Amino acid sequence: MQIILLEKVVNLGNLGDIVKVKDGYARNFLIPNKQARRATKEALAEFEVRRAELEKIAAEKLAAATAQGEKLGGSTVQINQKAGVDGRLFGSVTNADIAEALVKQGFAVEKAQVRLPEGPLKLVGEHAVQVSLHTDVVVDVTVAVIGEHV
């Protein structure tokens, strides 16, 4: 299916690009999330009329994410978790736990924005975590996992 992207989509394209994707991806994800429209003549004409407005909205989102990234970048989050004597946690620290701790510090972060490439944190200590505020704004946050010995 040919679609017009209404915003930047990771690994697909930028605003205004006409790309071919699988029908299910377009119908079930991109179109319902208002990230794309079918590439018909009418949709292309309407897109060209709204292009400046959509670019302005995209620039505002990027500016807001950059401002939040400057505040959030380099910050440290402390999370207390029960741990054994050897420093391994009983359970793990997930992206939801990190997002919750960031929200308590006053940052608007969702769990889907926290990236843990090696999976949940299972050891006591400091860990570098990436937070993706926008497709172009990714900041590093230090998570200090403090073990409460049982």
Curated annotation (Swiss-Prot):
Judging by the UniProt lineage, the source's domain of life is Bacteria
What are the record keywords, sorted?
Answer: Ribonucleoprotein, Ribosomal protein, RNA-binding, rRNA-binding
GO annotation terms (biological process): translation
List, alphabetically, the GO terms of the cellular component aspect.
Answer: ribonucleoprotein complex; ribosome
* Pfam families tied to this protein: Ribosomal_L9_C, Ribosomal_L9_N
GO function term, MF aspect, one: rRNA binding
Q: PANTHER family from the xrefs?
A: 50S RIBOSOMAL PROTEIN L9
General function of this protein: Binds to the 23S rRNA.
Per the similarity annotation, which family is this?
Belongs to the bacterial ribosomal protein bL9 family.
Q: What is this protein called?
A: Large ribosomal subunit protein bL9
